[in-house]
Amino acid sequence: MSLPLNPKPFLNGLTGKPVMVKLKWGMEYKGYLVSVDGYMNMQLANTEEYIDGALSGHLGEVLIRCNNVLYIRGVEEEEEDGEMRE
């Protein structure tokens, strides 16, 4: 069982690293976390959109509003180059 984390230091620690953001509506976005504001809105760079686990397209720079996020996780380097793992 994992320990709960304070979200602001967690997100600040992910800044500049590859992340996967899943929205409440099922879409997933993989990119580099550029910044997070006080409301936890997120800016991603080099973003790819995945729908049902399949690459849908390359979007580039994306801003995600905080209330749409289901979860965010760091992406390991192997995942960044290869296929997405669940």
Curated annotation (Swiss-Prot):
GO terms for molecular function: RNA binding. The keyword Cytoplasm applies. This is Small nuclear ribonucleoprotein F. The gene is SNRPF. The modification N-acetylserine is found at residue 2. Plays a role in pre-mRNA splicing as a core component of the spliceosomal U1, U2, U4 and U5 small nuclear ribonucleoproteins (snRNPs), the building blocks of the spliceosome. Component of both the pre-catalytic spliceosome B complex and activated spliceosome C complexes. As a component of the minor spliceosome, involved in the splicing of U12-type introns in pre-mRNAs. As part of the U7 snRNP it is involved in histone 3'-end processing. Belongs to the snRNP Sm proteins family. SmF/LSm6 subfamily. Core component of the spliceosomal U1, U2, U4 and U5 small nuclear ribonucleoproteins (snRNPs), the building blocks of the spliceosome. Most spliceosomal snRNPs contain a common set of Sm proteins, SNRPB, SNRPD1, SNRPD2, SNRPD3, SNRPE, SNRPF and SNRPG that assemble in a heptameric protein ring on the Sm site of the small nuclear RNA to form the core snRNP. Component of the U1 snRNP. The U1 snRNP is composed of the U1 snRNA and the 7 core Sm proteins SNRPB, SNRPD1, SNRPD2, SNRPD3, SNRPE, SNRPF and SNRPG, and at least three U1 snRNP-specific proteins SNRNP70/U1-70K, SNRPA/U1-A and SNRPC/U1-C. Pfam families: LSM. Keywords: Acetylation, Cytoplasm, mRNA processing, mRNA splicing, Nucleus, Ribonucleoprotein, RNA-binding, Spliceosome. GO terms for cellular component: catalytic step 2 spliceosome; cytosol; methylosome; nucleoplasm; nucleus; pICln-Sm protein complex; small nuclear ribonucleoprotein complex; SMN-Sm protein complex. GO terms for biological process: 7-methylguanosine cap hypermethylation; mRNA splicing, via spliceosome; RNA splicing; spliceosomal snRNP assembly; U2-type prespliceosome assembly. InterPro entries: Lsm6/sSmF, LSM_dom_sf, Sm, Sm_dom_euk/arc, Sm_F. It is found in: Cytoplasm, Cytosol; Nucleus. Its main location: cytoplasm.
